[in-house]
Amino acid sequence: RFSIPPRVQKDISEFNNDNPFKIIYVSTIDQYKHQWHVVTAVNSLRQKGYPIRLELIGPAYSPALKKLNEIANRFDPKRDWMKYYSEIPFEDLHKNYARADLGLFASSCENMPNILLETMASGLPIACSEKGPMPEMLQDSGIYFNPEEPEEIARAIYKLLSSKSLRSNLSKQSHELSKKYSWERCADETFIFLNKVKTSFYK
């Protein structure tokens, strides 16, 4: 479902207020996910005239949602360009990825982030947190930033927004890399299953 071939990238001149550059960030709204820093970063780019729309998707913890709403109310009180959806059925989520131009992941603490793998498989160029294990997974197929620094997030977004060729190359790289992880996970799960069968057989 999430394996979407990388699409043909548009030049920055093709984006406008009626057809904005769409960023998607799927993750739980939580303190270590830094959605408010992402909103701040996008606002700074919009203030410079770049037509960007931000879509945040995921359930929320109350304190973090309150913090997000405070920032959103300051920069986009009418929610013209920042959209938040608390729940989207998993079977429909791939449609949101398919409509996006850029995937973003700003977590500062993860184990094995499936959401990052989904974003990679969705054929999107990715701006990503520099905190581990994200660089180990995405390798050289993304543009990295410190998730606690809105200025760095903005620079990473702009680097991708401004370069059609960079977006094209990185989206192809990350999409291919996602296939490797899919096969590795399949092999690992098969190995675990066979071990369980073996253990049960010899009991």
PLM segments and residue spans:
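A short, well-ordered alpha-helix in the C-terminal region of glycosyltransferases
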Residues: 159, 166-180, 189-192, 196
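Short hydrophobic beta-strand element within catalytic cores of glycosyltransferases
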Residues: 125-128
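Nucleotide-activated donor-binding/catalytic signature segment of Leloir-type glycosyltransferases, i.e.
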Residues: 67-91
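Conserved donor-binding/catalytic core segment of Leloir-type glycosyltransferases
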Residues: 15-33, 39-42, 55-57
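Aromatic "clamp/platform" in nucleotide-sugar-dependent glycosyltransferases that forms part
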Residues: 108
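Acidic anion/phosphate-binding donor-loop and adjacent secondary structure
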Residues: 1-19, 92, 201
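Conserved acidic donor-binding segment of nucleotide-sugar-dependent glycosyltransferases
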Residues: 143-150, 159-164
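Short alpha-helical donor nucleotide-sugar binding micro-motif in glycosyltransferases
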Residues: 88, 95-100, 117, 153
